[in-house]
Amino acid sequence: LSTLLLSGEKAMDEDAGNEHIVVVPRLGTISSWSSKATDIAHACGLEEIDRIERGICFSYLAPMDLNNELFNQIKMAIHDRMTESVLDKDFDLQNLFLQQQPEKLNEIELVTQGKQALEIANSELGLALSDDEIDYLCNHYERMQRNPTDAELMMFAQANSEHCRHKIFNADWVIDGKPQSEKLFSMIKSTTEASPKGVISAYSDNAAVIEGFEIDRLMSSTADREFVFTKEPTHIVMKVETHNHPTAISPFAGAATGAGGEIRDEGATGLGAKPKAGLTGFSVSHLRIPDYPQPWESDFSHPDRMASPLEIMTDGPIGSAAFNNEFGRPNLLGYFRTYESSLPDLPVNEIRGYHKPIMIAGGVGNVRDQHALKIDVPEDAEIIVIGGPAMLIGLGGGAASSLDSGSSSEDLDFASVQRGNPEMERRAQEVIDRCTSLGDKNPILLIHDIGAGGLSNAIPEAVDHSKHGALLELREVDNAEPGMSPMGIWCNEAQERYVLVINKERRQEFITICERER
């Protein structure tokens, strides 16, 4: 273990300063570095290790005791408050690895306390429920004569959020007193309806598919375990989405997981596809580069809880590129623009800009002809989650991204940001590739990626498609945090995970593929 951890550049002399500050990943979270390092240790045979975590010890010379103001300035300069914690001098490092007992399912006392209990839960859990939705839930549970659980409310909030339902784009519009026949989404879809030639699927799967070409595909042969070229029709997968809220809170992690989520959407198209190349785009407010003022930049205020435009453009593109590179997909193109302007002609002077940025992640891939479309799922099929473990990160991300910026607490904002582990996503993609290489014997009957809302969104999507019910065992979900409540397991947005449905008879065959790819 010492050889593994002490390789590379040596640390400076610990006695170089008379004061020390230790910075670690934010308490209560598991960093992606920790997940990777622990996994590498296990792969090297060090099975006794439960978890490895990394911190940085900063040494500095201080001629006198620093007052709190100066000490806080030093702390702010050396750590990212959204992703890291500064430890007190008397902090016991063993507490980094404390494992809590599993939390219980909580009920919201709607029966005894009425609507107010739901309004409090809406605020405390960051559910972003509207007044109409709160009234709807109150009436629903009153008819059932029982209290809602926190897992049910969080699930409803994610699945019914603007992020997942696109309520604005699906809303009816009245312009100048005249109801409009088209909705925004139907207007977007009308182009495909008017020109359907070459479109295999659009607006019905995790990504769109258009007709491709006959090409040589390099795939592994299960029989002799050799890679062979096979000439066959191969179609083009296309996807673009945004990841704005997480990028505003933590630019590197937000942009990285934005790219990772788009990659998973491509891989989870049809019965399994292969991501090939990516794009990234950013729209932010003016950069205000220190000591490099520009005539069009005014000193407008900026929300403290959000990263500055300069921080976003310093860390965000690197986060996206890093995930693409570590996954093994080139990020080939993108765009970048700034915009911020005063609108003095309005009754109240307004300033418009991208304090909450636009972060676009997109890409193209390919899919075999026989796997381009989803199929019907038989009864008694098994639902399986593959990829990384459940972790208490990204909780409530779908609802958080639907809130007006600044209307939730800083802790809720942070909780809604995911953390990326591209190596794990690569492994999961290798499982998909091995399955699709089997052609007509592909064991995958249905596949969805796990994104906003976690399992609470992805599994109901799969169950709804199957037209059957499902029996779920939450405690059997791979979980890195044993203290997580049922709501946490059901709704967390830990990354690099997919929901698959496979034939029960082929379970062991599928597990063998997963074990080979670790």
How would you describe each model-predicted region?
Residues 497-498:
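Conserved beta-strand-centric core segments of catalytic alpha/beta enzyme folds
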Residues 1-406, 410-424, 428-442, 451-455, ...:
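Core nucleic-acid recognition elements
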Residues 492-494:
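A structural signal for short secondary-structure junctions
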Residues 465-486:
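Anionic-ligand anchoring segments at beta-strand to alpha-helix junctions in alpha/beta enzyme folds, i.e.
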